[in-house]
A protein has these predicted regions:
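Conserved beta/loop motifs at nucleotide-recognition and modification sites
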Residues: 1-205
């Protein structure tokens, strides 16, 4: 590196730079993109620049005969990341729709997603919801919560909307159940796939 004269920064750009990059592509293709479409696109593809580039290429091909990209277009063609599927799962837990919860879970298993990772993401999601709900109860607005947690306003709004379906006591109880099942699965006292199913059946049944 010293001989070449400078180091290259391969870190992921921030959201502002990614937005500029992607919007330039949209504009170059002669399209527009709604804010809610961009929010959903970013949520589904922000794990890497390669993934984002590939998903945008796919999206632009899908809307080749349209003037703009809508939320419905993104939902129709862009692949969901695992954490987005887990959010959907929890939405169905909130509405007590156990068949949908189990359908989503088995879909993730079919793509070789490890049950322990799914359980970890469920725990992470409820942890976030608990912290956000607590901050909101102290009078903090979405922007303040987003700044303190280092995440996007859009994510805070989505999580707070979902968190309204649970009391603080329910979230605490669910996290205790999840932590217990996680420990039992990791020590071999219960099958890891069954651990997630037991948690979902208890809370969505």
């Amino acid at each position: 590196i010293a001989k070449a004269g400078s180091a290259v920064d391969f870190s992921m750009p921030d959201e502002r730079m990614l937005t500029s990059w992607m919007m330039a592509r949209v504009k170059a293709a002669g399209k527009t993109m709604t804010r809610d479409a961009w929010n959903e696109f970013f949520e589904r593809s922000n794990d890497s620049m390669d993934h984002m580039d590939m998903e945008m290429e796919k999206l632009l091909s899908y809307v080749y005969d349209k003037d703009g990209i809508t939320l419905e277009d993104v939902e129709a063609i862009c692949t969901k990341q695992v954490h987005t599927k887990v959010f959907d799962m929890i939405s169905f837990v909130a509405s007590k729709n156990l068949p949908k919860v189990l359908d989503l879970y088995h879909d993730m298993l079919a793509t070789k997603e490890p049950p322990i990772r799914i359980l970890a993401l469920i725990i992470r999601q409820f942890d976030q919801m608990y912290v956000m709900k607590d901050m909101a109860s102290q009078g903090m607005n979405v922007q303040t919560i987003a700044g303190k947690m280092g995440i996007r306003d859009f994510i805070v709004r989505k999580n707070l909307g979902l968190a309204r379906n649970f009391t603080m006591e329910q979230i605490r109880a669910l996290l205790e159940d999840a932590a217990d099942l996680d420990e039992r699965a990791k020590t071999g006292r219960i099958n890891d796939q069954l651990a997630v199913e037991m948690l979902m059946i208890k809370w969505a049944g």
